[in-house]
């Protein structure tokens, strides 16, 4: 399983420098939608990292798909986006058990 990152240039640069190969740089909402759809269809991606603000800008149906996605598991970083979940909540949703208990 691979890690993918979707975001604006300043968000994805660090991931790119860290060696992440599947980096999708976006400039607007249509490019964001296209990148998210591409990642959701790619079965080799296990984790998707996005900024909360970019997720909040997506259409409702696409946000719902991301929130319900088990593979890839979506990790939202930064901001205080609507419906943001902690990493703990995401792992609990994906695995079905709270591993911190």
From Swiss-Prot:
Main localization, broad class: membrane
Keywords (A to Z) from UniProt: ATP synthesis, Cell membrane, Hydrogen ion transport, Ion transport, Membrane, Transport
Keyword Membrane: yes
Signal sequence extent: none
Compartments where found: Cell membrane
One GO process term, biological-process aspect: proton motive force-driven plasma membrane ATP synthesis
GO-annotated cellular components: plasma membrane
GO molecular function: ATP binding; proton-transporting ATP synthase activity, rotational mechanism; proton-transporting ATPase activity, rotational mechanism
Functional description taken from the UniProt entry: Component of the A-type ATP synthase that produces ATP from ADP in the presence of a proton gradient across the membrane.
Known partners and oligomeric status: Has multiple subunits with at least A(3), B(3), C, D, E, F, H, I and proteolipid K(x).
Name listed for the protein in its UniProt record: A-type ATP synthase subunit F
Gene source species: Methanosarcina acetivorans (strain ATCC 35395 / DSM 2834 / JCM 12185 / C2A)
Lineage of origin: Archaea, Methanobacteriati, Methanobacteriota, Stenosarchaea group, Methanomicrobia
Gene giving rise to this polypeptide: atpF
């Amino acid at each position: 399983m691979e890690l993918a990152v979707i975001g604006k240039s300043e968000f994805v640069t660090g991931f790119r420098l860290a060696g992440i190969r599947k980096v999708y740089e976006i400039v607007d909402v249509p490019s964001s939608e296209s990148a998210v759809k591409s990642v959701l269809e790619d079965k080799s991606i296990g984790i998707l990292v996005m900024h909360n603000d970019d997720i909040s800008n997506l259409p409702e149906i696409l946000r719902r798909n991301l929130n319900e996605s088990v593979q890839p598991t979506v990790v939202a970083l930064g901001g205080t986006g609507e419906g943001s979940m902690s990493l703990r909540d995401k792992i609990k949703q994906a695995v079905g058990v709270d591993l911190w208990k």
